[in-house]
Amino acid sequence: MSMFLKTIEIKGFKSFADKTELIFTGGITSIVGPNGSGKSNISDAVRWVLGEQSVKTLRGGKMEDVIFAGTQFRKPLGLCQVSLTLDNEDKKLSLEYSNITVSRRLYRSGESEYYINNVQCRLRDIHELFMDTGIGREGYSIIGQGRIDALLSGKQEDRRLLLEEAAGIVKFRWRRSEAEKKLENTEVNLIRIEDILHTYEERLKPLELENKKADEFLRLSEELKDKEKTVLIYSLKKIQHKIDKLESSMERITSSNRESHLELTKLREDVNGYNIRMENIMDESTRCEKDYYDKRELINQGENKIKLLKQKIEDLEDNIKRNYLELKQIENDKIKKSEGITLQNQNLLELKNREKEVNIGILDYENNIKKIEKDIYSRENICKKLKEDKIQYFSNISKLRNHIISIKKDGENIVEKIDKLKSSYESYSKAIIISSEKKNKLLGEISNIKKNISVYQNKIDENNSGILELTNVLNLKENSLQKLNALYNTLEANYKMLVNFHKHYEGYNRTVKALMENIKNHKLDVPAQSCFLVGEIISLQKKFETCIEISLGNSISSVITNNEIIAKIIIKYLKDNKMGRATFLPISIIKGRKISNLHKFEDIKGFIGVASELVSYSKEFKDVLDYILGRTIICENIDNAFEIAKLAEYSFKIVTLSGDVVNSGGAITGGSLQKRSSNIIGRKREIEETLVKIENTKETLQVLNGDIRRIKSDKEKLHCQNEDFKEKIHLDNIELTKLHQQNDTIERETKKLIESRETANREIKLLYKNKEVNLNELQEEEKKLKEYSKEEIKNDDYILKMEEELKEGRNRITDLKEGLTSLKVKRAQISENILSSERELSRLDQEIKSMDIKNRSIVEEIKLSEKIIHKNELNMYSNEKEVKDLKQYMEKLQESIEKSHVKTIELKQKINVSNEKVDNLTLIINKKETSFHKIQLELTKLNSQKDNIYSRLKEDMNITCDGDIEYDVQIENLEEYKSKIVHLKSSISKLGVVNLGAIEEYKNLQKKITFLSSQKEDLIKSKQELKKVIDAMTEKMKGVFKENFVKLKKNFNDTFRELFKGGSADLVLTKGDELTGNIDITVQPPGKKLQNINLMSGGEKGLSAIALLFAMLKIKPTPFCILDEIEASLDDANVLRYAEFLRKFSRDTQFIVITHRKGTMEVSDVLYGVTMEEKGVSKIISLKL
């Protein structure tokens, strides 16, 4: 059999949340299901796995939309995967596999992966694999309703792609396209190389000149360097001779100056002594003078204060006299102001009484005006309302007259409609009786089938409950099995690890570990049973492991021997092999140690026991264990340990359960314990416990495996029963569907008839009501018309009466407002007089208050002045006494100052003599130092010249030390030698700017030009060969397309005539050659004129497109073809023709058809149903026909 699609596996793609597999055989497979169930998601999945990149084609907004997005009860998935498996026994695809599986995987992050037979590949590899097979996103193996429309009326490019796929030139076009790309790249590379070559060749000539100049520059530079080197060494030799002479002179000056400096130092010390004594005398003199002047200043200040105080006393006495006179004047002014206040109060009372009378008159006027204005406002509103009513009456009367005419006309129309509807009602009633009889018969048949389905479904539900229960139990058992297996593996690994640790002495120090291994392997001439490790011979409860291990310390690695002879042999072996040191405990000589008066500690809270008594061991090791642990007590905590230690006077070790230690002598060890990688003491216990756990786990695993096998067997039986019941239900459902369709048709017809009859009946009743309403409305409207006419006359009379009353009221208001204005003017005048009188009262009152305040202020001022006079008199007496004392003290200071002046003159004479000697000696020293500095400067200058020469020798000649310099250089004529150097420099200068890199650059450029010239020749040859390939490929494509296009035209005409039972169809190549021209479709259905396909009806278009599809399949059958509801627009007769063609073509092509149509289902070999038992999640049900 030729290649065909074996399976589609979908997981997480769109609505297929669970892993779903569709298995296909040859022939026709139909996929059916209600709208929205996810049928088309299967064709989208195939299109997607074949490399579709258009999100729009996949009916999404972005590529991640194809991943299952979750439902109310399910979480979104992180990836989706689709796999197609094809049978490739005939090796139609270019891979050496019988089955080829193509897969695509997409992650929610946007990352996409492609696989061929589970090997990751590129999208391009998948396109190349299916090229010219009709399979692929651009092929015609997947045709949907949208693709049908594109085939007929879409872009010319899309149509040509499909027809070229059928004509078998896609592979050639792809190869030509690849060759064109290579040619384009070759041309670009050729242009690039030519540009680079041109640039290099332009650069080569100037670079050749620069290369020659650089060579000349290097030759002259080398000669100049040699001559400059000779001159520099010769100069260095002469400079060194001068330096030696100058250094000798410096040593002589330094020696002479040293003696002069000693003498100068002694003279300066004498001068300093005189200066210090003189400074002390002068300091004392200065202090006395300062004190003298300070006291004189104080006397002046005291005398000034006395004068000032006398003046202040006189001023204050004058001020008191003036204040008394001012008090008397204030009292007289106050009496006059009080009399003015009394007069103003009388005037103010009279004005307020007159103002009250005027206010009462104004209030009466205002009340009368408000009352009349209110009445006028009310009448104006009534008048306005009456006028509005008049307009409304006129409008209502006009409307009523028009409405009455309309009502009479409506009544006549209602009578005509009632007669027509009565006739229709009787016709509908007869048709309903006939439909009801048909429906009753069908319902009986449907009821019987439903009962059968219900029985089968109940049995399936019972089985499903059983399956679910078994599945839950199975899941629990399998989870338990998985956990137990993991536990078993962990226990086994732990057991092996512990045994391995025990076997290889893991946890002991390196020396002991190696020693015991060698003893066990008989590398040491010692019996294996004569040596034991302390950590191996003891066993104990788990709770004591930490404290005993801490108690043992390094002793845990001690080696127990039967006697001291074995210990000596082992020690010698360790020394000879340089294996390190170990501690040995010979049983024959070791003596145990005990705690005396142990009973004293046993009653203390927290005491547990002696460490040696808490472990188990063989009797032969008792002395050894007593030696190690006999003087160690174990207690519960650190507080207990301190209590025991104090009582025992810190004479032995105490260890707590948590590992804290109080050592003998008082040292304390404690804190957190690091996790132990190897528990030596508890290892035996751990091995035994782990072995028991392994055995128990094995037994449990055997029981669980037996339970799982039994549950799976029971579950399989229930599944088989369910499949039988489902098969029966499926057959009944097909029959039930047919009956339901018939019943639905009858119900729809009956419903329409009933609705039509009810509509007619409702309309009749409504018309009768309308007729009655019409009559009542007519009578009411005529009655309203009479009433409105009467009301209109009354309204006009009332308006006239209101307007006369309004006129009278307005005249009355005018008279009252004139009287009110007169009174308000009078009130304003009185108010002004009152305000003026109040201001005068306020002014007088304020002046009296100010006088009172001033009076109090003057009295206070007099009292204060009297106090100040008394205080100043006291200060004046005190200052006079102080001035007298200061004058006596000043006389004593004057005597001390005169004595200090005499002593200062004597010391200055001595200092002048010594300073003269210092100056003479300093002059001599300075002259010597000046000579010394001159020599130093000359030396510095010479050394600098010397360093410069060394620097030049180092930098220019690469001479780095004196050893490299040959000082025997001789120059007969230095000036002539320097002249040659100047000539060389001039020659170098004439060369101008020199590019030393040009030498290397010139060589490299020559190499590059040679290489690029070779590359250019290769590219020209490649370009010519590619052009030949493209021309040959183009001719091949034209030939193949032309040949197959003729066949395709014939096939299209034949299939069109078969499907339409006559007519004709053609494919026409226009505007260009075979590879670029447009391809138009022209058709002529039977009995119609020849026309463009775009002018046909939807059904005709659909059938024409199907004809073209089958024509393409005739010329080049695809291994499989997926058709997604392409017959949707066809009527039942054309669906049958389409189905016949499917059956006919299914001999060469495998068809997977997504359909709703009964005719297509009937020719199918296998039916797959797509349902959504869970909202948002598609599920597949299969049925082989």
From Swiss-Prot:
One of its GO terms (molecular function) is DNA binding. It is found in: Cytoplasm. Residues 534-644 form the SMC hinge domain. Belongs to the SMC family. Homodimer. Contains large globular domains required for ATP hydrolysis at each terminus and a third globular domain forming a flexible SMC hinge near the middle of the molecule. These domains are separated by coiled-coil structures. HAMAP family: Smc_prok. This is Chromosome partition protein Smc. It comes from Clostridium kluyveri (strain NBRC 12016).
